[in-house]
Amino acid sequence: MKRSLFGRVWPNVTAVVLFIGLVFPVYWMFATAFKPTGDIISENPVWFPTDITFEHFKTATEADHFWTYVSNSLIVTVCAVVFSLVIALAGSFALARMRFKGRRGFIVGFMLAQMAPWEVMVIAIYMIVRDASMLNSLVPLTLFYMMMILPFTILTLRGFVAAVPKELEESAMVDGCTRAQAFRRVILPLLAPGLMSTSMFGFITAWNELPLVLVVNKEAESQTLPLWLTSFQTVFGDNWGATMAASSLFAIPILILFVYLQRKAVSGLTAGAVKG
């Protein structure tokens, strides 16, 4: 039975409206960053910038400690993602391949940790960091970001490991590989989509995190970009062009990562949910 014209059109119209609603704020942020100040404060909105200027980006990048915030964000984010992947590879393999007492309890524990609201634990984390004399340090940020990422990473990679036929691993071991060599040469290459999807999730989570760094790092030398952006009125006042330029610079790494990995990341998330 053929669907009516409305039945064929409305899903597309809805998708277009949602797309515009989601993309327009991002477009407006980048467009404002390139507009001259006169166009930004004009009573008549300038939808498409014609006079392109990079002055706002210069103002943002020349702000105090800007590059310190950038380097701090990159350090804690990359380290947290890499450490979580290394640990998750071992943990996901153990949960998917090995049978041991308490295995289901571990899986339930990781699920509960994934659902836990980390914001309510900020005060407890602050007390731990304070008692360890590690305030205003990047080390606790890296460790706790890794803990935030780890449950999702383990559960997702577990699905990928479980989907790899055991016969492939056994064939490699028959050919003379140890179990570690079989994992590295056979299983690890097949986990590439899962590694990409979990890497993207971990990068976005750590890159955008604010409550923890707001509490444990009070000195500018140990703060990250999200905290710097929250103080834009103090830094830039009413200079909305510089504010949008700073926000654009903050968003660019995530956009690049998403565009580069989005196909494999989406296929990785769906494939990792099939079996496990």
Swiss-Prot record:
Signal peptide residues on this chain, from the entry's feature table: none
Residue ranges of domain ABC transmembrane type-1 in the record: 70-261
TM stretches of this protein: 14-34, 74-94, 105-125, 137-157, 186-206, 241-261
UniProt topology in membrane: Multi-pass membrane protein
Biological process annotations from GO: transmembrane transport
Keyword line: Cell membrane, Membrane, Sugar transport, Transmembrane, Transmembrane helix, Transport
CC per GO annotation: plasma membrane
SUPFAM superfamilies noted in UniProt: MetI-like
Induction record: Induced by (GlcNAc)2 and (GlcNAc)3.
InterPro entries: BP-dep_ABC_trans_perm, MetI-like, MetI-like_sf
Subcellular location(s) of the protein: Cell membrane
Free-text function comment from the UniProt entry: Part of the ABC transporter complex DasABC-MsiK involved in N,N'-diacetylchitobiose ((GlcNAc)2) uptake. Responsible for the translocation of the substrate across the membrane.
Subunit relationships: The complex is composed of two ATP-binding proteins (MsiK), two transmembrane proteins (DasB and DasC) and a solute-binding protein (DasA).
Family from the record: Belongs to the binding-protein-dependent transport system permease family.
Name of the featured protein: Diacetylchitobiose uptake system permease protein DasC
Biological source species: Streptomyces coelicolor (strain ATCC BAA-471 / A3(2) / M145)
